[in-house]
UniProtKB/Swiss-Prot annotation:
Gene Ontology BP, a term: taurine metabolic process
Protein name: N-acetyltaurine hydrolase
Organism: Mus musculus
Binding site for a divalent metal cation 2: E169, H201, H230
Keywords tagged on the record: Cytoplasm, Hydrolase, Metal-binding
Length: 349
């Protein structure tokens, strides 16, 4: 679209790409995660229902999806405002808010947060995984889904005039469902018409990212403007990672700060820690993919906020970047990952 071409679309309107600065490409500021509540371990039911307190924070850190209050990030708008001001003070400029239909997207709150903090916020269009799809969503054709995505970018989301600036995160399960496949095809069709950025949440299997890219390609997507999220919990084998990198999408390591003994959403996966993430990013840089890497935290629960002793949205800037420099990555490369790559991805063609 000519009016969008060369611009980035935030919840406050179009901006020049050069205005973004350091950008986190996969975060949540207001959402609910009730659909993914996990029953607590035996004899821990009482703790799971307590308010979040200092004495149970350690338990919540180990069982984040078994505490119902922890899944209500939408209750912390004031704390999020303070976090974004801190993020800006530490050198942050922009943030992509990946909450889509099914996770209680709230574009009014996103607009308020952008106005209050001066942080550029880009909202996400589309649908999360099948478990959150309504009967109406499942009944839609690819053409109808395409129209929904285009409308959320050109006219506004959720009955408002507040426009999304990316499609995604588009949720995919493993195995992929029929409804998710239709939405992927609609995503490709909408992207082909709009020239917009796309971001994908893959299923928790090493084959999922490959399958998703293939479906998008066959439906006409621009893979060079597509992000594959959560690679830190999805592709572990280096050879397999390089095979995937050759497909040309952005490679996102977006779980910085998440260091779990037990990954409740997929217990067979051993979640890497931040040192392993840093080594994996370094590996991709050494292999020539510095222009394809993106980083974020994917905060979506209360316990990861600074208010509750968590790392917050400034963790990458205050802790990860210094460690990366210590490990031999250069300022130039880190500026590429945090400034240039997000800018290139978020700019409409």
């Amino acid at each position: 679209m000519s009016s969008l071409s060369g611009k980035v679309q935030t919840v406050l309107g179009l901006v020049e790409p050069s205005q973004l600065g350091r950008t986190l490409t996969h975060e949540h500021l207001t959402m609910t995660f009730d659909s993914f509540y996990c029953p607590p371990p035996p004899c821990h039911e009482v703790t799971s229902k307590e308010p979040i307190m200092m004495k149970n924070l350690f338990w919540i850190q180990k069982n984040p999806y078994s505490h119902r209050e922890n899944l209500q990030l939408n209750q912390e708008v004031g704390a999020i405002r303070e976090e974004l001001l801190y993020f800006k003070a530490k050198g942050g400029g922009a943030l992509v808010e990946n909450t889509t239909t099914g996770l209680s997207r709230d574009v009014h709150t996103l607009k308020w947060l952008a106005e209050q903090t001066g942080v550029h916020i880009i909202a996400g269009a589309g649908f999360y995984v099948d478990a959150t799809h309504s009967a109406a969503t499942r009944a839609m054709s690819v053409e109808q889904l395409t129209d929904v995505l285009i409308n959320e970018i050109l006219h506004g989301a959720d009955g408002t005039s507040i426009k999304c600036g990316v499609i995604g995160e588009i949720g995919c399960s493993w195995p992929l469902t029929d409804s998710e496949r239709k939405i992927l095809e609609a995503t490709a069709h909408a992207q082909a018409q709009l020239g917009c950025p796309v971001i994908i949440h893959p299923g928790r299997n090493p084959g999922a990212p490959f399958q998703i890219i293939r479906i998008l390609q066959e439906a006409g997507a621009d893979i060079s403007k597509t992000v594959m999220s959560h690679l830190d919990r999805t592709i572990f084998d280096k050879k397999e990672l390089l095979e995937f990198a050759q497909l040309g999408c952005y490679l996102e390591y977006d779980l910085f700060g998440t260091e779990l003994l037990n990954y409740q959403l997929s217990p067979d996966i051993d979640m890497p820690d931040d040192n392993k993430r840093i080594r994996r990013v370094h590996f991709l840089v050494d292999e020539g993919y510095e222009d394809r890497i993106l980083m974020a935290h994917d905060i979506h629960t209360k316990h990861r906020l600074m208010k509750y002793g968590g790392h917050g949205y400034s963790h990458i800037l205050t802790n990860i970047v210094p460690k990366m420099l210590l490990r031999g990555l250069t300022e130039r490369v880190l500026d590429k990952i945090l400034i240039e790559n997000p800018k290139q991805w978020l700019t409409f063609k």
